[in-house]
Amino acid sequence: MREEEIQEHQLFISSLFLWVKLKMQNKLSSKRKKMRWKIIFFIIASTPFRWIQSSYLFFKLSKVNLETNQPVFVIGHWRSGTTHLHYLIAQDKQFSYLEAFQAFFFRVAFVSKTFMRPVLNYFMPSTRPQDNIKIDASAPTEEEHPLTNLTEKSGMQTFFFPQNKTYFDKYNIFENTKENEKRAWKKVYHKMLCQIALFHGKDKKLLLKNPHNTARIKVLLELYPKAKFIFIHRNPYDVYQSNIHLYNKTIKSQF
């Protein structure tokens, strides 16, 4: 199967501090030098906008209250149909959700949405490479993407650096995770959800879809005791074959 050459990366609008930390924690493939330089370029170019957004959100995030309107989580193994279910439930206007634009430009979304949303729509493929599901800048997507943009404490970092499964072990299944590391994960995750809620109007209930959360139910309930979970499953043989396809089309092209 032909390997898909991914032109963009979730770490484009991260921080230099996070990028250096990830480089120190991983041995990067020599084949991906061009992508590494692109990441550094976009990190530097986005720095002023990240500072402006941080200042803008400094007092606003503290006013977002997720205690009284706790999230609904769609969970299930990768390739089980979580995206289809997320798209379907997101049609209900009582919910707000993370859209692709905010996910990709998370650190600058509030200050760049007027001019960057049409740019993203122009450059985005019309379908996802792994399954041909239609996407655009407004499509619902999973919050694990911006989590990788904010911290190394994300299971998806193992997707970006497939030779290092520490991220998955420590921040998906919380195996051998120190208590202070778990607290740090909760803090950054909660702050991220507040930012997602604020982007769409903080009074709506958050609808979140994230296969990584399937292994985090206990930790999420510590954060949101009244949260609801919707679990979807699929024939495991189909799931296995679909994940092989996902690996060959996207994950294989990472660092």
Residue ranges and their predicted role:
Residues V74-Q91:
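Glycine-rich phosphate-binding P-loop
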Residues I75-H77, L207-P211:
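Short His-Asn-centered micro-motif
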Residues Q91-F101:
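Post-Walker A helix-loop "phosphate-sensing" segment adjacent to the P-loop in P-loop NTPases
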